[in-house]
Amino acid sequence: MSNKTYVYNAELREQTGTGASRRLRREDKVPAIVYGANKEATSITLDHKDVIKAQESEGFYTQILTLNIGGESVETILKDIQRHPFKPKVTHLDFQRIDANQKLHTIVPIHFVGEDVVEKLGTTVVRQLTEIEISCFPKAIPDFVTVDVSKLVAGDSLHISDVALPAGVSSIDLAKGPGHDQSILIVKANKSAPTEDEAEDAAE
């Protein structure tokens, strides 16, 4: 569970639709929706500058986000973020309300440690996953999952089942069965630089 809190101010949005959303974006507002927890969906807006700053934090994508909406604090998680195809602008956000007594599905990043040790051995860690989909109660969401690669050698690999998840946290993929135990990484030996003779042979 994260010790950091993520709180953002939002305003209720009465006008919806493409035209209204376009006007809001011109005013540097980001249209968004809050849904879930057996309640009606609520249309809101956030300041674009706040969203741009928020997305710099890894926790914005994985942790509980408290939205202050019209005097009410609503606990949510981010479910979707839409961006402009070529401008550095966020165009829409989807938030899901959370219930402290119900498990949720979310994604947390993988932090790899010990890669410097592997590199000194002339090998490289090839990442095949950078995040894991998990199920847990809201308060148990970890900031990230750590994978230590320092003792791996060329030819080694790790799968989701090799990762030690925190107590109360389970893998969505593993719950689907053994066939969904995805590879997280493999370790490959670096190709040695060709000798002078090998380089000459290759040129002939």
Curated annotation (Swiss-Prot):
Out of the domains of life, which is the source? Bacteria
SUPFAM superfamilies associated with the record? Ribosomal protein L25-like (SSF50715)
Q: Does the keyword Kinase apply?
A: no
Q: Which UniProt keywords apply?
A: Ribonucleoprotein, Ribosomal protein, RNA-binding, rRNA-binding
Q: Which Pfam families match?
A: Ribosomal_L25p, Ribosomal_TL5_C
Q: Which GO terms describe its molecular function?
A: 5S rRNA binding; structural constituent of ribosome
Q: Which Gene3D superfamilies match?
A: Ribosomal protein L25, beta domain, Ribosomal Protein L25, Chain P
* 4Fe-4S listed as a keyword: no
Residues passing through the membrane, by range? none
Membership in a protein family: Belongs to the bacterial ribosomal protein bL25 family. CTC subfamily.
- Please name the HAMAP family in this protein's record: Ribosomal_bL25 (MF_01336), Ribosomal_bL25_CTC (MF_01334)
Q: Which PANTHER family match?
A: RIBOSOMAL PROTEIN L25/GLN-TRNA SYNTHETASE, ANTI-CODON-BINDING DOMAIN-CONTAINING PROTEIN, RIBOSOMAL PROTEIN L25_GLN-TRNA SYNTHETASE, ANTI-CODON-BINDING DOMAIN-CONTAINING PROTEIN
The protein's role, per its UniProt record: This is one of the proteins that binds to the 5S RNA in the ribosome where it forms part of the central protuberance.
Q: By what name is this protein known?
A: Large ribosomal subunit protein bL25
Q: Which organism is it from?
A: Pseudoalteromonas translucida (strain TAC 125)
Q: What is the lineage of its organism?
A: Bacteria, Pseudomonadati, Pseudomonadota, Gammaproteobacteria, Alteromonadales
* Gene that specifies this protein: rplY
